[in-house]
Amino acid sequence: MEKLTILLLVAVVLMSTQALPQGGGEKRPRENIRFLSKRKSNAERWREGSCTSWLATCTDASQCCTGVCYKRAYCALWE
């Protein structure tokens, strides 16, 4: 069973290294290679402008880069 697991791991590594050069040689932007993270970090959301910065007005925590909408009035660093 251990040999099978090691064999599968080696096969996955070999397949992943072969898949990288088959991209056609073009350089892809970094944001297109996000296969490990599903959520954007607060800094990424702020850079893209999809969230409001600290002390900006808000009505919901999802609007704030920090994730904290204090008393449904403004974005705070912490509660």
From Swiss-Prot:
Propeptide ranges, please?
Answer: 20-47
Phosphoprotein listed as a keyword: no
Signal sequence residues: 1-19
Task: Spell out the disulfide connections.
Answer: C51-C65, C58-C69, C64-C75
Q: What is its main location?
A: secreted
Q: Per the record's keyword annotation, is Ribosomal protein included, yes or no?
A: no
- GO molecular-function terms, A-Z: ion channel inhibitor activity; toxin activity
Subcellular location per the Swiss-Prot or TrEMBL entry: Secreted
Going by the entry's taxonomy, the superkingdom of the source organism is recorded as Eukaryota
Q: In which tissues is it expressed?
A: Expressed by the venom duct.
Q: Which UniProt keywords apply?
A: Disulfide bond, Knottin, Neurotoxin, Secreted, Signal, Toxin
Q: Name one GO cellular component term.
A: extracellular region
Q: Indicate the family of this protein.
A: Belongs to the conotoxin O2 superfamily.
**Domain remarks in the Swiss-Prot or TrEMBL record:** The presence of a 'disulfide through disulfide knot' structurally defines this protein as a knottin. The cysteine framework is VI/VII (C-C-CC-C-C).
Q: What is this protein called?
A: Conotoxin TxMEKL-021
Origin organism is: Conus textile (Cloth-of-gold cone)
